[in-house]
């Protein structure tokens, strides 16, 4: 069973069994929080945009003074740690990546799997960044930006299958 306490779950958002969503958390319409993920807004607000997905085993948390905002259509890969940061629309944060307090990741970005985005790092719109610490590598191609959107849409569809 999922655990939801004091969260604002909007429209057709979905929280999987075993996931935990607590505190000052808003899940936008069509967003999803997958198995064993934790979204914990006990110290500062967390907003997950419409159609975004928080995949299995991920932790999203916010510290006092560092709220967390995830844009629309964004994918947070399995076992990522998202902590007190801002992530734009249609961005993919790869599996196992860590994004720290005060980091700002733009829209239409990819953060490579296993990357560490350190506190206060800024990744501009449309960029690929990876490494530990993560560095901007190059602009995304239009095909990569489209794939980000396709990924988000596929998770919206999978969410609807899981709910049935």
Regions from the language model: what does each represent?
Residues 6, 11-47, 61-65:
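N-terminal first-folded block
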